[in-house]
Amino acid sequence: MYRPRPMLSPSRFFTPFAVAFVVIITVGLLAMMAGLLIHFLAFDKKAYFYHSSFQILNVEYTEALNSPATHEYRTLSERIEAMITDEFRGSSLKSEFIRTHVVKLRKEGTGVVADVVMKFRSSKRNNRKVMKTRIQSVLRRLSSSGNLEIAPSNEITSLTDQDTENVLTQECGARPDLITLSEERIIGGMQAEPGDWPWQVSLQLNNVHHCGGALISNMWVLTAAHCFKSYPNPQYWTATFGVSTMSPRLRVRVRAILAHDGYSSVTRDNDIAVVQLDRSVAFSRNIHRVCLPAATQNIIPGSVAYVTGWGSLTYGGNAVTNLRQGEVRIISSEECNTPAGYSGSVLPGMLCAGMRSGAVDACQGDSGGPLVQEDSRRLWFVVGIVSWGYQCGLPNKPGVYTRVTAYRNWIRQQTGI
């Protein structure tokens, strides 16, 4: 008799392998959708920069506000930046606001005007006109906050990335994180990248690297006097810019070399010189000046500093062709002058920096190069000039630098800076 074929129950189809396959496909689709969402949220946004000015009604302008090196300039700038930041953090723009920076404090009448750049991150489809209106509405509330009386300007200018770079590279001591108003600070490894130390100069004798230096204006380089002891004629010297001494971004002839009259090759006292360039240097992301400290700036033992240069990696070795950087600590003159150290050879116009264990140090070919420190506003100041030391990287024998604060008036007399 005919018997129909039995129907397979649905449960027979869903074997463990089939269930696993469905789960894998489902998870894969969900992961893909999440990835697309993350990509959209991350890459749909871009940075927007704006410039504005603020009149400070209850602060009188003084000469101390003329330089970012002074305590007064730093304190007032930080107060203004904190007020603006707090206002945006408590507004509807809190998720879009990134950072603000006072570019300059200037005189207007007897009062102070602060020029400020602000950074936001928002959708690429952002309506700039609407964004500008929203920013203005937040800034209008500044007059009633904090203990500064601020009158925000109604003028808010949208800046391109290039505009922002042009504005911020006119300020001394700006590294890449400040030029882009980034929240990240990265200094890693020993190899410097283009733009990391934009004030670094290679002073070359007959087109061969001989000493380092630091650009302190568009016409002047700060360096060590001992670099020119045997070769004082400027016609043999050029200054190059960029991380490579073999293929520099820019090469400029030297017009004049002004070494300190009191330099002693015996005591190494007054080991400082300024070099005048033959032509003005145009500032950019990769080439601009470092800040000079105030004569009263306190260099604190134990604080972090960075030394940069093309010096040899070991005592007696060859110079390198790509710029290197080293993190060191400031060491007190008392510690540096102990019998285990330099036994009193470190004079008041000198500064010690290195590591107690040795290892990281300036070496031959680094002479004249800068020792720099960062302030609370991410501006970098040259506090030392590579001068001398016993060999390189030995315990208790740190590098000895010319103390720039001790020669601040001399630098001003020679250069007008």
From Swiss-Prot:
Positions on the Extracellular side per record topology? 39-417
Q: Which GO terms describe its cellular component?
A: extracellular region; plasma membrane
Its Enzyme Commission number(s) read 3.4.21.-
Q: Which domain of life is it from?
A: Eukaryota
Q: Identify its membrane topology class.
A: Single-pass type II membrane protein
Can you give the residue ranges of the Peptidase S1 domain?
A: 186-417
Any Pfam family the entry gives:
Trypsin
Q: List the disulfide bonds.
A: 172-291, 211-227, 336-352, 363-392
Q: Which residues does the entry place in the Cytoplasmic compartment?
A: 1-17
- The regions listed as transmembrane in this protein's record are 18-38
Q: What is the active site of this protein?
A: 226, 271, 367
**EC class:** hydrolase
Which SMART domains does this UniProt record tie to the protein? Tryp_SPc (SM00020)
Task: Give the family from UniProt.
Answer: Belongs to the peptidase S1 family.
Q: State the oligomer form and interacting partners.
A: Monomer.
| Protein's name in the database | Transmembrane protease serine 11D
* Taxonomic path: Eukaryota, Metazoa, Chordata, Craniata, Vertebrata
